[in-house]
Amino acid sequence: MSKKIVVAMSGGVDSSYTANLLQSRGYEVIGVYMKFHPREEYHQKNIANIQKVAKHLGIEYHVLDRTKEFQERVYQPFVDSYVAGLTPNPCAMCNRVMKFTELIEFADELGVDNVATGHYAKTDGQFIYEATDKSKDQSYFLFNLKKEFLPRIIFPLGDWYKENVKKEAMKILLLKSIAEQKESSEICFVETNYIDVLKEHTEVEMPGEVVDTHGKVIGEHKGYMHYTIGKRKGFRLFKAHQPHYVLDIIPHKNRIVVGTKEQLEKRQIVLRGLNMFLDQKEFDCYIKIRYRTHKVPCHVKIDGSVASVTLKEPVYGVAKGQAGVFYDEEKVLGGGWIV
């Protein structure tokens, strides 16, 4: 008898091919699509793709409306973070509090042990690892998964290169149009840019002061929520300067602090809200402070839910609210939120 598995399906090529791959390995695939926001046109297009795949594979699929839960657990905290002068990482948060939690709970309702997604990552049931395709690796966004979920998760695309997934999908007539469609943006509820999302909920266009590290007013900006640490454009300085970067954001004063690249340098970072797969309290490893940055060697000391990180080489653009993820080569050891 074939083993059942619940597959998160988005209507894109990765999750569609994941379902196809698992069926070819003998699994009885049950597809599930989760609505996380009220953009109905977006959902209808995705569900139409899932219907195609389900028909081709002869599998059942379910549509779960989790708009209310997403609003409370991910969307509102995203808005609140920017209002507080932080730079949030909604995908890493969503993977923990929404996507995988809802997927596991739905599998439990059906009495199914395993779940799968089209993420480019690997797991051995204890740790998460980088995908073979480093250009598409999503392990950074998965550091926050509950440890007890890992033995139940399968990432079939962990050893695949994206270009090969698309090539193979193109060979299957009903998947061809899905393989040809444009890739979706990283943040599913952001159609254009995050500022447009914020404008729906709060005042964003608020001209304010640009100050140097001594508090001297040296320019003006268009509203602090437009900026993140390390940004060097979008504000005006009264006099010509060497390139200046955002060093800090002071929301209650609607101010941004700017300085030189040297002043942007960090060699110490503190993380809170840790999620660790490794039990050690002190260790050497690598840290990644943004999705598209390289890993930096560091020394970590953990005290409760706080990690003090000493970097062995400087990093720039460390933004409060972003995820700091610990690696041992390709293995994800855990991580937390930069404060």
Curated annotation (Swiss-Prot):
Region of interest called Interaction with tRNA, as start-end residue ranges on this chain: 136-138, 290-291
SUPFAM superfamilies hit by this protein: Adenine nucleotide alpha hydrolases-like (SSF52402)
Active site: C94 (nucleophile), C188 (cysteine persulfide intermediate)
Entry GO terms, CC: cytoplasm
GO biological process: tRNA wobble position uridine thiolation
One Pfam family of this chain: tRNA_Me_trans_C
EC number from the UniProt entry: 2.8.1.13
Family statement drawn from the similarity comment of this UniProt entry: Belongs to the MnmA/TRMU family.
Protein name, entry field: tRNA-specific 2-thiouridylase MnmA
Source taxonomy: Bacteria, Pseudomonadati, Campylobacterota, Epsilonproteobacteria, Nautiliales
